[in-house]
Design a protein with these regions (language model features):
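Loop-to-transmembrane-helix entry motif
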Residues: 1-6, 36-40, 77-84, 158, ...
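Entry/N-cap segments of selected transmembrane alpha helices
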Residues: 1-17
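Transmembrane helical segments that form the transport core of multi-pass membrane transport proteins
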Residues: 2-3, 23, 28-29
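Hydrophobic alpha-helical transmembrane bundles that constitute the permease/transmembrane domains
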Residues: 10-14, 81-88, 165-168
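Flexible, glycine/charged-enriched surface loops at secondary-structure junctions
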Residues: 29, 66, 71, 165, ...
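Helix-loop-helix junctions within the multi-pass membrane cores of secondary transporters/permeases
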Residues: 38-121, 175, 187-193
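Transmembrane alpha-helical segments and their short flanking loops
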Residues: 91-193
Length: 193
C-alpha cells in the first residue's frame, strides 16, 4: 500500500501536472517544479496546506509570475478544496483495506469509492491527517469495518507529508494555468531561471 500510494502520488505530481501545464498554459514543467521545490519541502514538513499558503503565495507571485489578483484567490481556494492527493489516498486505502479483510468489491462499489473520495477530499480540512478521518465515511459506505483504519494510521504520517506536497503543487499549477488563460501571467518571470 505504502509503495503504491507514493508511486501514484509522484506519478500524479510529475505526469498529470506536467501535462496540464504544457497543454493548457504552454509552460515548461521543469521550471515550475524547480521553482516549487522549497514550497513542496515546506508542505512536506508541515503536512498542512493551510500553513503553506503564505509560502505558496510568495512563490507563485514572485517566482512563477502569477499576478497577485489571481494568486490571492486561487491559492487559498485550492488549499481548501484541491485535495487530489487525499482523494488518491482514500481510494487506494479503501481498496487496500477491502483486500486485507477479504471483501470483494463490485464495480458499483468501486464507482462509489471514486465518487466519495472526490467529494470527501473537497470537504477535508487543510490540516494534518484530516483525510484519514474522512476515510471512515468511505469505509462505512461500502460496508468495510471501521477498525481496519488502524492499518492506515500506522503509516499515515509520512504519506500525509507526500499528499500535502502534491496538493500544494496542484494549487500552484492551477494558479499558473488560470493566470495564463486570463493574461495575468508574467512569462518572463516564470521563465527566469
Amino acid at each position: 500500500y505504502v509503495i503504491l500510494l507514493i508511486f501514484v502520488l509522484l506519478f500524479h505530481l510529475t505526469v498529470t501536472y506536467s501535462l496540464l501545464l504544457k497543454l493548457f498554459a504552454n509552460l515548461n514543467p521543469l521550471i515550475f517544479f524547480r521553482k516549487m521545490r522549497n514550497v513542496a519541502l515546506f508542505a512536506f514538513s508541515t503536512s498542512s496546506s493551510a500553513a503553506t499558503i503564505p509560502v505558496t503565495l510568495k512563490t507563485v507571485t514572485d517566482d512563477l509570475g502569477v499576478k497577485k489578483d489571481v494568486s490571492s484567490f486561487v491559492v487559498p481556494v485550492g488549499a481548501t478544496i484541491n485535495m487530489d492527493g487525499t482523494a488518491i489516498m482514500q481510494g487506494l486505502a479503501t481498496m487496500f483495506i477491502a483486500s486485507t479483510v477479504g471483501v470483494d468489491l463490485t464495480f458499483a462499489q468501486y464507482a462509489q469509492i471514486v465518487f466519495l473520495a472526490i467529494i470527501t477530499s473537497i470537504g477535508t480540512a487543510a490540516v494534518p491527517s484530516a483525510g484519514t478521518v474522512t476515510l471512515a465515511l468511505i469505509l462505512g459506505s461500502v460496508g468495510l469495518p471501521l477498525d481496519a483504519i488502524g492499518l492506515i494510521l500506522a503509516v499515515d504520517r509520512i504519506l500525509d507529508m507526500v499528499r500535502t506536497s502534491v496538493n500544494v503543487c496542484g494549487d500552484a499549477a492551477v494558479s499558473c494555468i488560470v493566470a495564463k488563460s486570463e493574461n495575468e501571467l508574467d512569462e518572463q518571470t516564470f521563465n527566469n531561471r
